[in-house]
């Protein structure tokens, strides 16, 4: 369960860890939240007009509104790549890999508005 380049989540979509214990949800209020038994991490974008969360070909995970304006991103634009992947670990952490090397994770960074 992961996002690769050019994949996207819409409101209500989610990623689930392989062990099924954690879920990352792009909520209807535009907040992207990791849940275990309780919320563990959030993009803090609740109430924004964002409608989709896109894994771009440059390895930047970006939340856009309906007009195509960025509302949040991981600030990981690194140029085109062969493989870019966002996944939720069995420990409840979002990890973004470029060419199998970690370039961002939710434990160390909230992302940027």
From Swiss-Prot:
Name of the protein: B-type lectin plumieribetin
Annotated tissue distribution: Expressed by sting venom glands and is also found in skin mucus. Not found in other tissues tested.
Subcellular location: Secreted
Subunit structure: Homotetramer. Interacts with alpha-1-beta-1 integrin (ITGA1/ITGB1).
Modification after translation, per record: Not glycosylated. Not N-glycosylated and not O-glycosylated with the mostcommon O-linked glycoconjugates. The N-terminus is blocked.
Biological role: May contribute to some of the local and systemic effects of envenomation by the scorpionfish. Preferentially recognizes mannose-containing carbohydrate structures, but its interaction with single mannose residues is weak. Potently inhibits alpha-1-beta-1 integrin (ITGA1/ITGB1) binding to basement membrane collagen IV in a divalent cation-independent manner. In addition, moderately inhibits both laminin binding integrins alpha-3-beta-1 (ITGA3/ITGB1) and alpha-7-beta-1 (ITGA7/ITGB1).
Signal sequence residues: none
Domain of life: Eukaryota
Every Bulb-type lectin domain range: 1-109
Source organism (scientific name): Scorpaena plumieri (Spotted scorpionfish)
Cellular component, GO, one term: extracellular region
One Gene Ontology term of the molecular function aspect: carbohydrate binding
Origin organism lineage: Eukaryota, Metazoa, Chordata, Craniata, Vertebrata
PROSITE patterns xref list: BULB_LECTIN
Keyword entries, A-Z: Lectin, Secreted
Secreted among keywords: yes
Disulfide links within the chain: none
